[in-house]
Amino acid sequence: MAPTARTPTARTRDDRRATTRTARLRTRIPEPDEEPDLLGQYLTQIGATPLLTAEDEVRLATRIEAGVRAREELETADTGEPAPTPRRRRTLEETVHDGQEAKDHMVRANLRLVVSMAKRHAHRGLPLLDVIQEGNLGLIRAVEKFDHTKGFKFSTYATWWIRQAIERGLATHARTVRLPVHVVEQLQKLAKVERKLRAGLDREPTTEEVAAESGIDVDKVVWLRRVGRDAVSLDTPVDETGDTVVGDLIPDTEVLRAPEVAEFQALAAELREAVGTLAPRESLILSLRYGLHDGRPRTLQQVAQHVGLTRERVRQLEKESLAHLRAPENRERLLDWAS
């Protein structure tokens, strides 16, 4: 006996459920050995939907708009306006379902854009999967707001909404003490300036140097640094003897949490791909300089002694290597991880 064919309504319902499962990741924290499979399965799943052409985007957006108009007409009729005929109501309901199907399709086809942007923010206080979740919410909003008649490519339009959703999600959830979004943005600016000065000076910049470079007055820099502290150092003594520090009182969990494993794997993959484009000597210099192999950065002098070159030659090679990594094919990937 031949299998029963699914009705258009059933197909629409199944597609919508699939989109919901894809766009909204589960918040349960899996066991450590589950996480690579979960992330890999998600990436495989979202890759199953082909990317859209400009014509596809227009067609889907047109169907979405038709569905919105049909829904509004039904809601108006339900609030007391003259009711549509049964045939008209059936047509409107089918149009609503078709619009929802088109919306789900556009969301699924652009989930890879969210992952690409989420990787650039995953190291800023939220696990990678949580950042993807925030970005997916922005993507859904972009699909709802997209106006194809203005001639924009959807990915260009959606990027703004995804970035805003991720930034606000980080501002809301990434800190133990919640800070206003504008304060978080100032802290991010301050952190970038400090990294730039630290790299150029080869030492920690003073408050005055940070203020001058950032254009923020000294008192505001001091205040931002104070409110930006989100944790007590594990090396802080708990009494006057100094024999016991805060870290001694915290039990060792032995393993990283699963979302952290996924985040570190994503970053490690990006770094391996980028540094692998360098010559072996330059690759070693960057690995030592920034602690890529053991998490312990070295000074220029320490690197020079290790590789048998002068301090100035190491500085030159480091500068040349970083310039190579700032090339267009590498710049977006790595600078966004460092932002």
UniProtKB/Swiss-Prot annotation:
A molecular-function term among this protein's GO annotations: sigma factor activity
Pfam families the UniProt entry points to: Sigma70_r1_2, Sigma70_r2, Sigma70_r3, Sigma70_r4
Residue stretches of biased makeup (Low complexity): 1-10
Region (Disordered): 1-37, 71-101
DNA-binding region: 300-319
Residue ranges of the motif Polymerase core binding: 130-143
Keywords: DNA-binding, Sigma factor, Transcription, Transcription regulation
UniProt xrefs under Gene3D superfamilies: RNA Polymerase Primary Sigma Factor, Winged helix-like DNA-binding domain superfamily/Winged helix DNA-binding domain
Biased composition regions of type Basic and acidic residues, renumbered to the chain: 91-101
Biological processes per GO annotation: DNA-templated transcription initiation
Entry's family note: Belongs to the sigma-70 factor family.
UniProt cross-references to PANTHER family, sorted A to Z: RNA POLYMERASE SIGMA FACTOR RPO (PTHR30603), RNA POLYMERASE SIGMA FACTOR RPOD (PTHR30603:SF60)
Role according to the record: Sigma factors are initiation factors that promote the attachment of RNA polymerase to specific initiation sites and are then released.
Subunit and interaction comment: Interacts transiently with the RNA polymerase catalytic core.
Protein's name in the database: RNA polymerase principal sigma factor HrdC
The organism of origin for this protein: Streptomyces coelicolor (strain ATCC BAA-471 / A3(2) / M145)
Lineage: Bacteria, Bacillati, Actinomycetota, Actinomycetes, Kitasatosporales
